[in-house]
């Protein structure tokens, strides 16, 4: 077979099949004769090596299981109705009992990969008739050195004129408390522009590594490192707000237990 000359070899465009394999997504490839679902599964980006995936997958990748942990993914829920006032309230969201179930920790160490806060804030019949606007400030805080009982909102945060919207962690506590996430929700009372309830739905990835002592009970006092606390406070001084929340954490056990 005679060889092609230089002009023919380098001026002929690349074949369509090769161009598609190089630049297009696998889902845009033409279906071959006698193709089966296994071939479509084999062409997905998730089943290809990292060097053959698009650049997006190489830059923004995160493992399903946190570093130093093992599956399965466990879950723990905290469901309660809270009375949120101007002075604030705090709850610990890493209270997990030691055990062998899907909602228990197997040892002292586990990692909270993500947290989901869902529910609503609302006003009762007597408060929603008053003309006012009330905003609830939520702050998810990491306590690096838990001890005793959780500190109150005013003990952790420095506020100007006792206003929760101006709350910042006190200077002498910044090495212990870290605000991981913060969000807010607003309700309005009155006769005309009334909004008596507001939906709260927040999902955050935190990757917080929690350490317990040798005790089995799910208590704040049994934490030794990195407890997660949810602080809540409303901006109105005289009208409280009720919060019906379901807080769910997704965590993995550490391989060093």
From Swiss-Prot:
A motif (Nuclear localization signal) lies at residues 41-55. It is found in: Virion; Host nucleus. Keywords: Capsid protein, DNA-binding, Host nucleus, Host-virus interaction, Metal-binding, T=1 icosahedral capsid protein, Viral penetration into host nucleus, Virion, Virus entry into host cell, Zinc, Zinc-finger. Disulfide bonds: none annotated. Transmembrane segments: none annotated. Pfam families: Gemini_coat (PF00844). The keyword DNA-binding applies. One of its GO terms (biological process) is viral penetration into host nucleus. It comes from the Viruses. GO terms for cellular component: host cell; host cell nucleus; T=1 icosahedral viral capsid. A motif (Bipartite nuclear localization signal) lies at residues 3-20, 201-248. Belongs to the geminiviridae capsid protein family. This is Capsid protein. It comes from Mungbean yellow mosaic virus (strain Vigna).
């Amino acid at each position: 077979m005679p060889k092609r000359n230089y002009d023919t070899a380098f001026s002929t465009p690349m074949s369509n099949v090769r161009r598609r394999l190089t630049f297009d997504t696998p889902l845009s490839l033409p279906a071959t004769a006698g193709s089966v679902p296994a071939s479509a599964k084999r062409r997905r980006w998730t089943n290809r090596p990292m060097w053959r995936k698009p650049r997006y997958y190489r830059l923004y990748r995160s493992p399903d299981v946190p570093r130093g942990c093992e599956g399965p993914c466990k879950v723990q829920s905290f469901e309660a109705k809270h009375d949120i006032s101007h002075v604030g309230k705090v709850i610990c969201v890493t209270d997990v009992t030691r055990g062998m179930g899907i909602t228990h920790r197997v040892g002292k160490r586990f990692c909270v990969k993500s947290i989901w806060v869902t529910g609503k804030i609302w006003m009762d019949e007597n408060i929603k008739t008053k003309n006012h606007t009330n905003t609830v400030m939520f702050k998810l805080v990491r306590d690096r050195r838990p001890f005793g009982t959780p500190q109150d909102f005013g003990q952790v945060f420095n506020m100007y004129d006792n206003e929760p919207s101006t709350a910042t962690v006190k200077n002498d506590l910044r090495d212990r408390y870290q605000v991981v996430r913060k969000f807010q929700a607003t309700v309005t009372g009155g006769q005309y522009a009334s909004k008596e309830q507001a939906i709260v739905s927040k999902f955050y990835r935190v990757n917080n590594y929690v350490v317990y002592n040798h005790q089995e009970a799910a208590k704040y006092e049994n934490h030794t490192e990195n407890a997660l606390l949810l602080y809540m406070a409303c901006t109105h001084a005289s009208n409280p707000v009720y919060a019906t929340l379901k807080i769910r954490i997704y965590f993995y056990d550490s391989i060093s237990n």
